[in-house]
A protein has these predicted regions:
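Hydrophobic residue at the +6 position relative to the catalytic HRD Asp in the kinase catalytic loop
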Residues: 143-150
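Conserved ATP-binding subdomain of kinase catalytic cores across diverse folds
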Residues: 12-109, 113-116, 120, 125-141, ...
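C-terminal catalytic region of ATP-dependent kinase domains
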Residues: 158, 164-360, 364-366
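Activation-loop N-terminal segment of eukaryotic-like protein kinases
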Residues: 150-156
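A short, basic N-terminal segment
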Residues: 1-17
Length: 408
């Protein structure tokens, strides 16, 4: 047996590697919610961190570990690969170790919340993930609801790849490969939704085929917006900035832009695109690591706070000063006021977003101003304490019948 792990993580030596993973009975085991898997998957806890262990073949484990490291190094939304345990318990067998993604939620939990809008949000997030992978030359090969985890993102969702067993990385991928990947995704989504309906976890009417087919339309619309070629007159160079801003509004940065001139005609095409425009800007300004829509919301609140400061002080306020004061006077006090026993319910940035939404709703009902302190107190007492603890979603009650590897 050999254990290879990244620095900064446990050595995992106290686990019973001489026993098949399915037969483990160990105090480090914890029951965590996750998607349906063809493999045995168990979860172990070391201090404040949880790790997923997946039993597979040695070649598959090494390949998936390498792919996940490659994708993560390129800042794509995937789970963190931690290590591979070789020849455990028998030669040729292996266990892939990944870090559990805090505040991540499986599809069956989200769709079982009886909120029909969530299905659309999950599809939108899945499309963004698939487009990001294809832009980076990644053929997934098994896009499904079970192979994705979602995190809340300021009213939207963000999707993370959690299974790269069939994934291939190329310099670029052809339209044919993209189409095939979409076909697989549509088929798998249909199957996943029908399974949920059959299990009774979805109690509302849902157009399974319509939702799955909309995935293709959403994908094609986003792919076209990000990659299409535009032609316009030489005097309309302002349209270059317009195109870039439209891509930024979708949450993507244009790192390189191909511009060709033929007489009085300009042809432009984005050639290097990276998702996370607002998240990068917020990180540069504040040091906060949040998701894209959360960053968009926080940046808007910083701008509003800066405008309020300028009206209050009667003079211009530098952006850096406004940002520092926002962190100290707005974001810090609100997120820091959450009692310790509630901090595992939502990520700080998501909770902050919900407080802003709650303040708006309170002001509408009151038809007058509501302070942050008032909104926060009402939110903590009436909303947050009723939220499930989503940092590490434990298994309570029924789960999908065909889920493999859960610690019952």
């Amino acid at each position: 047996m050999q254990i290879v792990t990244k620095q900064g993580h446990p050595d995992f030596l106290d686990l019973p590697w001489d026993v098949p993973l399915a037969e483990w009975d160990h105090p480090r085991l914890v029951k965590m919610a996750h998607g349906i898997s063809r493999h045995i998957v168990r979860f172990v806890r070391f201090d404040d961190r949880v790790y997923a262990l997946k039993a597979t073949e040695l070649r598959a484990a090494r390949s998936e570990y390498a792919v996940l490291r490659d994708l993560r190094d390129d800042h794509l939304p995937v789970v963190e690969p931690v290590g591979v345990v070789s020849d455990a318990p028998e030669p040729g067998n292996a266990v892939l170790i990944t870090r559990y993604l805090d505040f991540s939620l499986p599809y069956w939990y989200l769709l079982g919340r009886n909120d029909p809008v969530l299905a659309d949000r999950l599809m939108d997030a899945g499309v963004v993930l698939l487009v990001r992978l294809h832009l980076e030359g990644v053929f997934w090969g098994d896009c499904s609801l079970s192979n994705v985890l979602w995190r809340r993102d300021a009213g939207a969702m963000m999707a993370y790849l959690v299974d790269a067993e069939t994934t291939e990385r190329h310099a670029t991928i052809s339209d044919r490969m993209r189409d095939y990947d979409i076909d697989i995704a549509v088929e798998n989504v249909v199957g996943g939704l029908f399974e949920l309906q059959a299990s009774g976890r979805i109690e509302y009417e849902i157009d399974v085929v319509g939702i799955a087919e909309s995935l293709r339309l959403r994908y094609e619309a986003l792919w076209s917006e990000l990659t299409r070629v535009d032609e316009f007159d030489l005097d309309e160079r302002w349209r270059i900035e317009q195109r870039v801003r439209r891509i930024n509004d979708l949450g993507f940065d244009v790192e390189e832009l191909s511009i060709n001139r033929d007489g009085r005609t300009l042809t432009i095409k984005p050639v290097l695109i990276e998702e996370g425009h607002h998240a990068r800007e917020l990180r540069q300004r504040t040091g906060l690591e949040v998701q894209e829509n959360q960053a968009r919301r926080l940046l808007a609140d910083i701008d509003q706070f800066r405008a309020w400061l300028e009206r209050h002080d009667g003079q211009p306020i530098p952006r850096a000063v406004a940002t520092a004061r926002w962190l100290a006077e707005v974001y810090g006090p609100i997120t820091g006021a959450v009692p310790k026993d509630m901090r595992s319910h939502l990520e700080p940035a998501e909770m902050f977003h919900q407080v802003l939404e709650h303040r708006y709703l309170m002001a509408e009902r009151r038809r007058g101003e509501v302070t942050n302190d008032e909104a926060l107190a009402d939110y903590l007492d009436g909303v947050l304490k009723e939220q499930p603890k989503e940092r590490r979603l434990r298994l309570d009650g029924p789960v999908p019948a065909d889920t493999v590897g859960l610690d019952e």
